[in-house]
């Protein structure tokens, strides 16, 4: 099928009698509950279960191999190729399936708060609660914007349509297929709403760098003086917690672009973890759970409708989606200037990385490409003990282009705007996981605040003998023995052995970046 035929099929679907376009939040909440998709909690949130899939399905995600784009994509485990024929056949089947539904729901909106690079999107849903999720997560249009809205990309989500692998050419009944040429994202066989969010992020990670804009998997906030800070880190490293600061305004919690204008949020909402959530620990998220919010897989009493955020019986990956306006202390619209401080967060279960260290540009690019952390229980199915993981650019599942494209852009931006990068270990200290202890959040907050306030810009440092990292000798409010990881271990020989082991893992992982400059490898990585 060519793009015209694809568009005609889509037009026919959207002109059907079963279409609900741009319903309001109360209308979607009503639909979700009356159709038996979800229930209302005592706080007024819409709560749904996602069945078998309570997280992303990376093995079922494909990109169509197309002449116009195939030479740009970094093909492999993340970007799995699939043929146009497979896409076309599934597209026809999904459209036919959706035409036969009693009701469909359409959201029209945007990705990217910077008007210069904004992407117009539409999301077509089988479920009303999925459409409410899209309404709250993406950027909502004004009446004027809606009147002239023409979608650049369309997400089509049909969770109850299941592929037949033997016939349809997929690996399982589930599929997330992106056609960059036809500007369609086709999702079937999974009810996990996060697939919609991350598929649009993937599109932005493809489009923005081609406009000279660095797309980033990070949270961002800004101080009263306009000083912007970015927080990179994988699940469980403290990105959301550390960027929620009462003295700084939130730009966004997960996806951003960095253009010549500054930093902007790609989304219009937040998608936060709720496992073990409490009003004391994370008041901003807790207070955002109200009418209009969408809860995923959170345990709830069927009679009182009171949520139990400590109950991970359905999954540890319980979530809430809400518009960013549900957070009090935000920048609206979600745009700000150029970052002064960049924080790379890692949860090191080896317990050997410093709690904070200053990075040179080469080290920043090296650690950005490495994207090291320890995978913690609950972020993916089957993970019960922390295990080391390297996720390129702190977001490899969402990067269609070669990693070096993003790393080189980061290096250029650091040079252009004089940003200082810090590596912050929120993981273990005084020993590895099981013998050491988790870094105190109060210490991490103090160190991050000192970095953002510029107190570490000219501080005296010592160089770590294994990783070459520059460790501040003093940070007010943090014991000096905590700052140097080797000093925090009682058994120095055990520390040396663990540090050497992790350095070896870094070196082994970095072999896949054969085409990066020698300066990044030699000046950025471990000394041993």
Curated annotation (Swiss-Prot):
Pathway: Carbohydrate biosynthesis; gluconeogenesis. It is found in: Cytoplasm. Its EC number is 4.1.1.49. Keywords: ATP-binding, Cytoplasm, Decarboxylase, Gluconeogenesis, Lyase, Manganese, Metal-binding, Nucleotide-binding. Gene3D superfamilies: 3.90.228.20, Phosphoenolpyruvate Carboxykinase, domain 1 (3.40.449.10), Phosphoenolpyruvate Carboxykinase, domain 2 (2.170.8.10). It comes from the Bacteria. Its cofactor is Mn(2+). GO terms for molecular function: ATP binding; metal ion binding; phosphoenolpyruvate carboxykinase (ATP) activity. Mn(2+) binds at residues 198, 217, 254. InterPro entries: PEP_carboxykinase_ATP, PEP_carboxykinase_C, PEP_carboxykinase_N, PEPCK_ATP_CS. Involved in the gluconeogenesis. Catalyzes the conversion of oxaloacetate (OAA) to phosphoenolpyruvate (PEP) through direct phosphoryl transfer between the nucleoside triphosphate and OAA. This is Phosphoenolpyruvate carboxykinase (ATP). The gene is pckA.
């Amino acid at each position: 099928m060519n793009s015209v035929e694809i568009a005609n099929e889509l037009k026919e679907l959207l002109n059907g009698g079963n279409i609900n376009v741009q319903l309001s939040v109360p209308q979607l909440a009503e639909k979700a509950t009356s159709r038996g998709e979800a229930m209302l909690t005592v706080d007024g949130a819409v709560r749904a279960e996602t069945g078998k899939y309570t997280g992303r399905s990376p093995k079922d995600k494909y990109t169509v191999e197309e002449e116009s784009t195939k030479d740009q994509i970094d093909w492999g485990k993340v970007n799995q190729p699939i043929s146009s024929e497979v896409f076309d056949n599934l597209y026809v089947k999904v459209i036919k399936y959706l035409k036969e539904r009693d009701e469909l729901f359409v959201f029209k909106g945007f990705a990217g708060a910077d008007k210069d690079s904004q992407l117009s999107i539409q999301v077509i849903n089988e479920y009303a609660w999925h459409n409410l999720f899209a309404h709250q997560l993406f950027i909502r249009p004004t009446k004027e914007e809606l009147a002239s809205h023409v979608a650049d990309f369309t997400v089509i989500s049909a969770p109850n349509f299941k592929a037949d692998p033997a016939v349809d050419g997929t690996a399982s009944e589930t599929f997330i297929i992106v056609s960059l040429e036809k500007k369609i994202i086709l999702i079937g066989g999974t009810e996990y709403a996060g697939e919609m969010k991350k598929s649009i992020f993937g599109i932005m990670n493809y489009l923005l760098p081609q406009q000279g804009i660095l797309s980033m998997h990070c949270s961002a906030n800004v101080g009263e003086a306009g000083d912007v800070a970015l927080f990179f880190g994988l699940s469980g490293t403290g990105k959301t917690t550390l960027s929620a600061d009462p003295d700084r305004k939130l730009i966004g919690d997960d996806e951003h672009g960095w253009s010549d204008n500054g930093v902007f949020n790609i989304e219009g909402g937040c998608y936060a973890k709720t496992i073990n959530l409490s009003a004391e620990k994370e008041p901003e998220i807790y207070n955002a759970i109200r009418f209009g919010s969408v809860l995923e897989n959170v345990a709830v009493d069927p009679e009182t409708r009171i949520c139990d955020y400590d109950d991970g019986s359905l999954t540890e990956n319980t979530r809430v989606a809400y518009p960013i306006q549900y957070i009090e202390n935000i920048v609206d619209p979600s745009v700000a200037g150029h970052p002064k401080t960049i924080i790379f967060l890692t949860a090191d279960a080896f317990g050997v990385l410093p709690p904070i260290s200053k990075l040179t540009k080469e080290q920043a690019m090296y650690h950005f490409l490495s994207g090291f952390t320890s995978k913690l229980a609950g972020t993916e199915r089957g993970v019960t003990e922390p295990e080391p993981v390297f996720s390129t650019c702190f977001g490899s599942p969402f990067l269609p282009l070669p990693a070096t494209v993003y790393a080189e852009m980061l290096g250029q931006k650091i040079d252009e705007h004089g940003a200082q990068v810090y590596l912050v270990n929120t993981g273990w200290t005084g020993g590895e996981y099981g013998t050491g202890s988790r870094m105190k959040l109060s210490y991490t907050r103090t160190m991050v605040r000192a970095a953002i306030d510029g107190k570490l810009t000219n501080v005296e440092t010592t160089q770590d003998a294994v990783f070459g990292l520059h460790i501040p000798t003093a940070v007010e409010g943090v014991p000096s023995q905590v700052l140097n990881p080797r000093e925090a271990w009682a058994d120095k020989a055990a520390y040396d052995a663990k540090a050497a082991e992790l350095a070896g893992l870094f070196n082994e992982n970095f072999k896949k970046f054969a085409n990066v400059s020698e300066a990044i490898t030699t000046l950025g990585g471990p000394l041993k």
